[in-house]
Amino acid sequence: MIQSPPGSGKSVVISEITKLATEKGGRVLFLVHRKELIDQITNSFKVHGVPLNQVELLTVGKAKNRLSVLRKPTLIITDEGHHGKAATYQKIYEFYADVPRLGFTATPWRMSGDGFKDTYDYMIEGKTVEWLINNKRLAPYQYYSLPSIDISKLRIKNGDYSNQSIDDALGKTIFGDVVQEYVKHANGQKAILYAHSVEASQSFAKEFQEAGIKAVHVDAKTPKNERDKLMLDFRNGRIKVLCNVDLISEGFDVPDCTVTILCRPTKSLVLFLQQSMRSMRYQHRKTAIIIDNVMNWHAHGLPDTHHDWKDYFEGGWKKKGQKNIVQAKQCPDCSAMWPLSQKMCNLCGHDFSIEEKHEKLRLEAELELIEKEKVKLKILSEKKFGSDLKKNWEIAQARAKVNKGNPLMKLLYFYAKSDWASASIEEIAEVTGKSNYQISQAKEWLQSKGIY
């Protein structure tokens, strides 16, 4: 499996590998999961001089149905290789069990937490998104979040949020809000909008049209001739906003599209990165704009947030992460854990209802620019304390900045409750920069509360 971020030039690499294989007399079976992707890779093959008479370029369904008549390939290449765990792909792989195979993907990740070791022997990691931005292979971006969704209403069905619960969580006002924020931050620029349902996508397009902005809805049921014309009009700038559900998630390339509008909450990291990075194709002096109306960054971070792809590839990451998950909430002041129904911390008197009020206000707040450092801080604050004192101090400081409170108290509280980690006053003083007296005073306060 070969991992490389969206927009990093996978089609060029695929074309070169295919060309090298055919030059040696080989035959390549190239699998895609959607017919819309065939034209794009065919064009790439032609540009790079790949002899098409030595390549079978098929959707996975068609390939499975033709196994008895296809000439045996010497190499199988799967586009969007994270789909390769599906039964249809597995039948093809089993039929050609002795044929080497490559799977290309931006995201070797499955919501189930399963890995890919049963399908691929190894994974090769490409450059990171951060590297690609710094080296002018992807456009830099500005990320905005409009908290116009009540996430408490989201419900999971078949692995992701159900359309009905998304309808309930979004409400009716989001349609006007999305147009308003597009005008405010990206007026006149080409934008791709991702909705959760055909009805929602059509409503967004109508709202843009009523505001005098040329927008259209397109989906998989749109006739091909009409869809091709709409895509051409979008590329030529006659259409400014292209509203869709899942059609423009993989293999769609419009380098001068500068704006992505996210209106579909998702638990899928794959979907989030494919959609959020759609406007990050590199052009000179281009800065992409990502408008997240559904707070997807809370679950997935930002496009250049670091991910441990090897851990995802090997599998089991979800089970590892769930071992110590407790249906509870943590006091931001003293780190004590309480039932979700708890209104006040019995140890330090922290009022949990303050966060609930702040959350409600935040959902009504203006669109705000999310700084990358803020996201990194949030991710760090959610890490668990461990055996490294310096790392624990970083986590304690991050928790204090994100959730308020005293970082020294958070650190000392952890060591007081831990039955396996320890640190002396002198060691804590050296790492934190606090005096022995300050640390002793803090310990005495905790002792007065029956903690030490």
From Swiss-Prot:
Domain called Helicase C-terminal: residue spans: 177-333
ZnF (unnamed) intervals: 331-348
Pfam family, one: Helicase_C
UniProtKB keywords: Metal-binding, Zinc, Zinc-finger
One example GO MF annotation: DNA binding
Residue ranges annotated for the Helicase ATP-binding domain, each copy included: 1-126
Keyword Metal-binding on entry: yes
SUPFAM superfamilies registered for this protein in UniProt: P-loop containing nucleoside triphosphate hydrolases
InterPro entries for this protein: Helicase/UvrB_N (IPR006935), Helicase_ATP-bd (IPR014001), Helicase_C-like (IPR001650), Helicase_Restrict-Modif_Enz (IPR050742), P-loop_NTPase (IPR027417)
Record's keyword annotation contains Nucleotide-binding: no
Further comment: The two substitutions observed in the protein always occur together.
Role this protein plays: May play a role in either regulating bacteriophages replication or specifying expression of its own genes.
Name of the protein this chain belongs to: 51.5 kDa protein
Organism encoding this protein: Lactococcus phage (isolate 7-9)
Lineage per the UniProt record: Viruses
